[in-house]
Regions:
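Eukaryotic scaffolding regions of large macromolecular assemblies
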Residues: 1-219
């Protein structure tokens, strides 16, 4: 299911011949599924178990963000947004699932820049908080990295399993099946069918938001 979502997200983002109707239909389906998922399962976040339990949520959310990064202009409907995508993202980023933390970092950072520029949702305060939490976690592990009797019990094996599972989860989120292959002849054949990031990125790639620049200065 995760791989299928990655293929859908990458294809909808990159395929040049798709109509607006087709793109909005897929986005509408994803937003409906994600909204329902949050309503039904958000309380489970407070229960025991790793966040990889919700990998289908993160794969679907990341696919939608990836689509939005490439197709955000098509989501505009006058003064409003198709699928009420602005209200949707505003709800999702503050959910207990915290997708800005657990989805692919590069995709989330680019989504945050575009979403802020388009007035959809502001993400950088949450990203900063996530980074601070991660830093505190790393420092805490360094302080507690001392021999103890607990290291010989099942606790260490549980922790090791969690680390392995988390790495597999992160690796899975980093798969983009329709990322470009730099083959000159093939590229000429595909230019009428394939959207390069440079076709839609504008200044987003080179000009990070002022907020993010300030955030980096403080870290």
């Amino acid at each position: 299911k995760v791989k299928s979502l990655q293929y859908i997200g990458s294809f909808i983002a990159r395929a040049k011949k798709l109509s607006k109707t087709q793109i909005i239909f897929v986005a509408s389906y994803l937003t409906s599924w994600l909204n329902r998922y949050v309503l039904e399962r958000e309380d489970e976040v407070d229960q025991s178990g790793g966040m990889e339990r919700f990998k289908h949520f993160y794969a679907a959310f990341q696919a939608l963000c990836y689509i939005f990064c490439f197709r955000h202009s098509l989501f505009r409907d006058g003064d409003s947004w198709e699928c009420e995508i602005d209200k949707f993202f505003q709800r999702m980023v503050i959910s207990k699932f915290n997708p800005l933390k657990f989805c692919n970092e590069n995709v989330m950072m680019m989504f945050a820049r575009i979403a802020q520029h388009e007035g959809v949702v502001y993400c950088f305060s949450i990203i900063e908080n996530n980074n601070n939490e991660r830093l505190r976690g790393i420092m805490g592990k360094a302080d507690s990295n001392m021999p103890s009797s607990a290291s010989s019990t099942g606790t260490s094996s549980t922790s090791s399993w969690s680390l392995v599972a988390r790495q597999q989860f992160i690796d899975l989120q980093s798969y983009f099946p329709y990322d470009p292959l730099f083959l000159k002849n093939y590229k000429r054949m595909m230019r009428d069918y394939y959207i390069e990031w440079s076709d839609v990125s504008g200044d987003y790639e080179s000009d990070e938001s002022d907020e993010y620049d300030e955030m980096n200065k403080d870290t």
